[in-house]
Amino acid sequence: MSDTFELIQRYLAAWNETDPPTRQAILAEVLTDDAMYTDPLVSVQGRDGLDATIAAVQAQFGGLVFSLGGAVDAHHHIARFTWHLGSGSGEPMVIGFDVVAIGDDGRISQVLGFLDVVPAGV
C-alpha cells in the first residue's frame, strides 16, 4: 500500500472486523509478520497477538466502531493519528492516539498506542 491514509483506514477496518478470518486477512495486508503493538494495557508481537487483542477489545466494547478522529500526519515512514471508539453518533466512549512505523514494504511494523479518554474502570 502506497497511500498512508488508506493504510491507516485499512488498519482501523481490522479493529472493526468481527469475522476472524476476514480480520486476519486484513491484518496480513497491513502488518508485517513480526509487527509490534504496544498500548497502556497490552504489548504483543506478531499478527496473531494483535488479532487476539482486537478480539478481546471487541468482546469488551461490542457494537462500538473505531474511526479516525482527524487527519493522518505522516513523514519518513512514521504516521500519527487520533482514533475514536464509539457508536458513530455523539461523543466517542474512548479516544486514543497511535504512532505507527511503516516498513519498506508499505506495511505497519510497529504501533505505539496511547489512551486519551477512557471510561472509568477500564
Question: Across the structure, where does each feature detected by a protein language model lie?
Answer:
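Generic secondary-structure transition motif, activating predominantly at the C-termini of alpha-helices
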Residues: 12, 16, 31, 58, ...
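Basic/polar N-terminal segments that are highly enriched at the extreme N-terminus
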Residues: 1-6, 118-122
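A beta-strand edge to alpha-helix "cap/lid" segment located at domain peripheries
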Residues: 57-122
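Short, aromatic-enriched amphipathic alpha-helices that serve as compact interaction elements
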Residues: 2-19
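Conserved N-terminal glycine/acidic-rich loop preference
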Residues: 11-15, 27, 31, 35, ...
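A solvent-exposed, acidic/Ser-Thr-rich amphipathic alpha-helical stretch
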Residues: 5, 22-25, 29-77
